């Protein structure tokens, strides 16, 4: 039985140059593992709380308090526990924090320990992380939802939609899907250059041109796909992360594309997009607390497209259960740092799958070189992963880990492809 012997922590930098927490765990059998915690730019109101230092250091974003929480409070509580009992370890973390939103110790401190323990236990068992968490049947490689054009909170432009993604659903393998996505990415750069548009990058590696709006951006990406010789729709589909909470104001509605719109008008806009473009997924099309709007939208177009709750659910089993009962959305975005422990993340995924909801594993805009979510995507069979453009090493690290996993699985590997999107309509 591998016992936790040492727990260490430090402040490191994420991909935006902001501090984050890294945790190291050593077991009595000599096993060692490390995990780094990501952070988001557009964060949901209901997410677990990151502990930041405040003050002038790092503009108030330092995490020395979270590091101290790991070293002074968490370590004494988990040292001596069995690393292979993840639920026991995570419950000890929750009990120690004692708040519903992890605000005392910080979700960044708690998650770092939770993930490092799981990685150490996998190492001790001599298993890849995806196999340790997912068991012998974990074999589905996810469709990479590549954010190749950035807007919203991820870019300083007038584009309101936060992410425009390509999904290589027609590829025969993850390796080929990655190639297709990379070729479309480079093709888009050429399309932008030819039109005199900027090719600077946003937080997640996608281009951030200042284009007229949603349809103009989708047209650019469609042209880039077709320029590679791939078929728009059957080979490579499109997806959006609207992040609508960012432009919603209670009482006045959605300030979208120079108009103030109601939830019903937003729904009409999305229905129009479905008629014109091969979209397979829309994330956060409405605000995180617009439950009535979500229910109406799901009833209107939920049989035609995947509607993903990110800010709506914040990977929280309780909010997800509420949404399932109401009939809001039909898919869950999974971000481990939104909820703060591996166990709660796995519980949310299980609830989603058992309720007929799809799941999409996701990074954050502030990432590190940690590749845990790549293993998690395969472990839980999510069939979809969102980890940015095929550029910037903190994004590519996850894609490269999935290449390794596909190679490890050999003939047992299966690429999810269009089966990840059962609502897909041929266009």
UniProtKB/Swiss-Prot annotation:
Localization: Cytoplasm; Secreted; Cell surface
Q: Identify which residues the record assigns to the active site.
A: 204, 335
Q: Which SMART domains match?
A: Enolase_C, Enolase_N
- According to the UniProt entry, the coiled-coil residues are none
Task: Give the record's GO CC terms.
Answer: cell surface; extracellular region; phosphopyruvate hydratase complex
* Keyword Secreted found: yes
Tell me the pathway: Carbohydrate degradation; glycolysis; pyruvate from D-glyceraldehyde 3-phosphate: step 4/5
- Which catalysed reactions does the entry list for this protein? (2R)-2-phosphoglycerate = phosphoenolpyruvate + H2O
Q: Provide the alphabetized UniProt keywords.
A: Cytoplasm, Glycolysis, Lyase, Magnesium, Metal-binding, Secreted
Which EC number(s) does UniProt give? 4.2.1.11
Q: What does this protein do?
A: Catalyzes the reversible conversion of 2-phosphoglycerate (2-PG) into phosphoenolpyruvate (PEP). It is essential for the degradation of carbohydrates via glycolysis.
Q: Which HAMAP family match?
A: Enolase (MF_00318)
Family affiliation: Belongs to the enolase family.
Q: What is this protein called?
A: Enolase
Query: Could you tell me which species this protein originates from?
Result: Mycolicibacterium smegmatis (strain ATCC 700084 / mc(2)155)
């Amino acid at each position: 039985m591998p016992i936790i012997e040492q727990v260490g922590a430090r402040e490191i930098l994420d991909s935006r140059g902001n501090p984050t927490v890294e945790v190291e765990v050593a077991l009595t059998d000599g096993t060692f593992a490390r995990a780094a915690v990501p952070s988001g730019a557009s964060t949901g109101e209901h997410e677990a709380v990151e502990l930041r230092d405040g003050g002038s250091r790092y503009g108030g974003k330092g995490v020395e308090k979270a590091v101290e929480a790991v070293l002074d409070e968490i370590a004494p509580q988990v040292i001596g526990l069995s690393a292979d009992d993840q639920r026991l370890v995570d419950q000890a973390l929750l009990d120690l924090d004692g708040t519903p939103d992890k605000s005392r110790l910080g979700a960044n401190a708690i998650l770092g320990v939770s993930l490092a323990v799981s990685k150490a236990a996998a190492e001790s068992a001599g298993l890849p992380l995806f196999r340790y968490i997912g068991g012998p049947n974990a074999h589905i490689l996810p469709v990479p939802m590549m954010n190749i054009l950035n807007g919203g909170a991820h870019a300083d432009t007038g584009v309101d939609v936060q992410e425009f993604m390509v999904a290589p659903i027609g590829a025969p393998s993850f390796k080929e899907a990655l190639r297709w996505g990379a070729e479309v990415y480079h093709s888009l750069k050429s399309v932008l250059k030819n039109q005199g548009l900027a090719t600077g990058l946003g937080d997640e590696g996608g281009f951030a041109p200042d284009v007229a709006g949603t349809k103009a951006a989708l047209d650019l990406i469609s042209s880039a796909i077709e320029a590679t010789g791939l078929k728009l729709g059957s080979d490579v589909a499109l997806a959006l992360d609207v992040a609508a909470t960012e432009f919603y104001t209670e009482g006045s509605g959605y300030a979208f594309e120079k108009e103030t719109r109601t939830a019903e008008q937003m729904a009409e806009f999305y229905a129009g997009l479905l008629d014109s473009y091969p979209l397979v997924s829309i994330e956060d099309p409405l605000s995180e607390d617009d439950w009535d709007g979500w229910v109406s939208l799901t009833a209107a177009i939920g049989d035609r497209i995947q509607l993903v709750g990110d800010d709506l659910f914040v990977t929280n089993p309780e909010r997800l259960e509420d949404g399932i009962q109401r009939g809001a959305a039909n898919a869950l975005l999974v971000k481990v740092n939104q909820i703060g422990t591996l166990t709660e993340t796995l519980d949310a995924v299980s609830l989603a799958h058992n309720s007929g909801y799809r799941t999409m594993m996701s990074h954050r805009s502030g990432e590190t070189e940690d590749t845990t979510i790549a293993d998690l995507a395969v472990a839980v069979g999510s069939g979809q992963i969102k980890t940015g453009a095929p550029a910037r090493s903190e994004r590519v690290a996850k894609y490269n880990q999935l290449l390794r996993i596909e190679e490890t699985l050999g003939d047992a590997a299966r690429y999810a492809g269009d089966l990840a999107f059962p609502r897909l309509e041929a266009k």
